[in-house]
Amino acid sequence: MKIGISLPVRELQDDVGAIKAFAQAAEELGLSHLRVPEQIIRPGSGPLHEPLTLMALIAGATEKIELVPSVIMLPARQTVLVAKQAATLDRMSGGRLRLGVGIGRDKVEYDALGMDFHNRGARCEE
């Protein structure tokens, strides 16, 4: 059985030292993976860091723990760029990235991006 943990980004906010320390402690405890949330916006929430960028920071502070973003909203991003970012992070972390993609479920996020919520499935298939 593999057991991981979610990075409490809202609680740790922008404290880079605390984020690194949390990731290192998770690794030292033998947890298999560290999950980083993916949300473009969330009204009333604290910091919502971009997950691939945040995982690059974590990769530099750890050696073994698997890096797992929650499902990346692919239709909200440029697909080739996501592929390049993910491949780079995976290579630079020694193959520790586990990537999942999906279409998202919150219309508020697509509205904030000026994108059509209703054709997100078709955009993801492209």
Regions found by a protein language model. Give the residues of each.
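Hydrophobic residues within beta-strands of alpha/beta enzymes
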Residues: 34, 67, 97-99
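Structural motif
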Residues: 37, 70, 100-102
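Generic, well-ordered alpha-helical segments
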Residues: 18, 46-50, 66, 74, ...
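Active-site-proximal glycine-rich helix-loop-beta segment
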Residues: 30, 63, 93-95
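Flexible, glycine-rich active-site loops centered on histidine and acidic residues
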Residues: 2-15, 75-126
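Conserved catalytic cysteine-centered active-site region
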Residues: 62-70
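N-terminal beta1-alpha1-beta2 module of alpha/beta enzyme domains
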Residues: 1-61
